[in-house]
Amino acid sequence: MGSSGDAWKLKDHPKLPKGKTVAVIVLDGWGEAKPNEFNAIHVAETPVMYSLKNGAPEKWRLIKAHGNAVGLPTEDDMGNSEVGHNALGAGRIFAQGAKLVDLALASGKIYEGEGFKYVKECFEKGTLHLIGLLSDGGVHSRLDQVQLLLKGAAKHGAKRIRVHALTDGRDVLDGSSVGFMETLENSLAQLREKGIDAQVASGGGRMYVTMDRYENDWDVVKRGWDAQVLGEAPHKFKDPVEAVKKLRQEPNANDQYLAPFVIVDDNGKPVAAILDGDAVVTFNFRADRMVMLAKALEYENFDKFDRVRVPKIRYAGMLQYHGELQLPSHYLVSPPEIARHSGEYLVRNGVRTFACSETVKFGHVTFFWNGNRSGYFNEKLEEYVEIPSDSGITFNVKPKMKALEIAERTRDAILSGKFDQVRVNLPNGDMVGHTGDIKATIEACKSADEAVKMILEAIEQVGGIYLVTADHGNAEDMVKRNKKGEPALDKNGNIQILTSHTCEPVPIAIGGPGLAPGVRFRQDLPTGGLANVAATFMNLHGSEAPSDYEPSLIEVVDN
């Protein structure tokens, strides 16, 4: 479809009026699961969300937020905020990073592209460094993809390979880092048997080393830079498996916050720093927690921390992590092309839009919502507000986060009369849920519920409409379960806390004084998912969705 005015024009909905203020509220990490002591949402007794579920059954339902419904390879793949907001904003299902990488590796096309050819130029004399999350969680990376990339790089000429492995414990169980490191070591040993000099060079926990996002805490990236590029870290080991085991024994240590370490040879020297003439590939397929490192690796004018030494390298991402910034400028697999998303359609049809969250999720209601695109479509019709997140802490310390501030700014935007749509992300359930602190997550859910209340009260005052949903599950089930669905126990008989997302469905609710009589959720879309939400809120704005969008979840029944 072209970009002329007529091509972007949305048809009027035959039964629903225009002119109502619509609030689209995304509760991050808020799925639906059986009520029990490990369901932080249930224990929190969230009265607003409870009333939406039980007050009008025809205006509340569950939708899918994982697997194929959000473009991921299998139904075992849990959703995440990136793909969730892509689907919410795009109104269609696009193959996402993990699936694109799978296809490129399976076909071998990854080795035929410009990105791989670019880094391959260093294979003869330099070292290939692979940096990323060592995990099978499938949210940011997958270990099997790394193993295939190692084999493929060796086959295509890499003679010296170093892996800088970040431990997970967030999308997978805490403590799983040891097994992942052992698996990686076995793969590297197989390469060594074939004459390839392949070793782990450094490591550290993802939330303490390298993988910050939205410029929340550059010290995280600096710790990674020091270990990976400079070969400097407070802990030195000869063996990476031993490194992880020993560092996990430190007080309050866990996989997410493992201290940075480097691997050294018999003389105590790092087995590899990143030097002039080397190649670097960041193998995460998810963008948000690679952008800051990509800037440090690629930008000549960089002032976020003292890099000390900036090697002349050839760098490529697994995908391009930021389309507007063209960052990185080289990448192995092209990211999904998402055009004609709902945000641009609404703006081109005169819908004045307000988007708000705090730093840790601000990019989700803007960049990811808008199809991996930064900036405004029309500054005269849009306003994006970022509330600075707390930095330097784990979010269970302050589980309320900035929910109140987000709600206040959104309330003010609604009452100002300047906007036709407000969309917000309330991060509490997800960000605090990732800490594994159930008590704090309960408080987080209460705070998010209170924020929803404030926004809905504003919608009530202006005679508007609300749509409340979530991007994926997390806080609703915070324990690992066995095949019988019972809480799983570790070797010491302790319950294994779950810090990852889930594959549970998420709620969606509609209502408000501006909702036309007879509007209800359809019964003929039992497998509806996040991609159906865009057409739904387009209808609430009084417009039909584009014909290729996933169908709206609502219908209007004449009374």
From Swiss-Prot:
UniProt cofactor note: Binds 2 manganese ions per subunit.
Any single Gene Ontology cellular-component annotation: cytoplasm
Gene Ontology molecular function: any one: phosphoglycerate mutase activity
Pathway(s): Carbohydrate degradation; glycolysis; pyruvate from D-glyceraldehyde 3-phosphate: step 3/5
SUPFAM superfamilies xrefs: 2,3-Bisphosphoglycerate-independent phosphoglycerate mutase, substrate-binding domain, Alkaline phosphatase-like
Record's catalysed reaction(s): (2R)-2-phosphoglycerate = (2R)-3-phosphoglycerate
Compartment(s): Cytoplasm
List of residues binding substrate: 140, 170-171, 206, 213, 286-289, 361
Stored CDD domains: iPGM (cd16010)
Keywords recorded for this protein, A-Z: Cytoplasm, Glycolysis, Isomerase, Manganese, Metal-binding
Cofactor(s), by name: Mn(2+)
One of the GO biological process terms: carbohydrate metabolic process
InterPro entries tied to this protein: Alkaline_phosphatase_core_sf, BPG-indep_PGM_N, Metalloenzyme, PGAM_B_sf, Pgm_bpd_ind
Quaternary data: Monomer.
Family: Belongs to the BPG-independent phosphoglycerate mutase family.
Primary role: Catalyzes the interconversion of 2-phosphoglycerate and 3-phosphoglycerate.
NCBIfam families (UniProt xref): pgm_bpd_ind
Protein name: 2,3-bisphosphoglycerate-independent phosphoglycerate mutase
Taxonomic path: Eukaryota, Viridiplantae, Streptophyta, Embryophyta, Tracheophyta
